[in-house]
Amino acid sequence: MREVTTAKSAGFCFGVRRAVDMVYAEAKKDNRVFTLGPIIHNEQVVKDLEKKGVKVIDSVNDISEKENTTIIIRSHGVPQNVINALKEKKVNIVDATCPFVSKIHKIVKQASEDGKTVVIVGSDNHPEVEGIKGWCVSKPIVIESASEAEKLDNFGGKKLCIVSQTTFNYKKFKDIVDILSKKSYDIDVMNTICNATEERQTEAGTIARQSDAMLVIGGKHSSNTQKLYEICRKECENTYFIQTLDDLDLQQFQSFRSVGITAGASTPNNIIKEVQSYVRNE
């Protein structure tokens, strides 16, 4: 029988579990329920919620009826102006923003009000980063690579406040901070990478290093799953990114005696178990 090692940290993190539970709870009520963007980056969960009457909207402008309407803010969070727009609509607001993300909103708001330049380490077009940018009172700088950090110019003596997308690669964040520190900037470094993310990345790398092949399970739009794939790929050449069991070609695994499995923060446990059972028993 093939040896299969599944990461203990694989699957829903605290913030995602909290957000998903909140949506399912609202779906049981009589109100019309909408999420502002997909609640998490997992197609299976979003489709299941749709069956229960929960619809996805892309913008506050998509709200046509206000009475008996509940709008759920997803775990990634939103800019402050979106919160204000929802309040003006007078709809019922359920804020499922991850508490770790909400903490970043407070940090950047205060730092920018104090006159500091906010540097966000993360993917500029990721919804979490879009939300963080929207809590800065002055324009922040977003970087996601060491080369971008090298190109940053002097800020005229202004103090920098550095934060990170919660799901960013910890090693890359540290490398970027090291580069900015060597430029002699006056900086406040706030390591806002979620502990669960750091633990997940470390464990995934360790398992990949010890396995003949590695499976990374998660939504194709999931940033944290993509980062897991990058980490595992560096440690194990035979690393595969799948969303569900349907994406798995077991013919690729015939010669592998040991297979590691990890999953992104938006991957339900039932999908992980299904893949684990199939790989172990085939």
Q: Where on the chain are the PLM-derived regions?
A:
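The feature marks the mature, well-folded catalytic cores of soluble enzymes
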Residues: 1-282
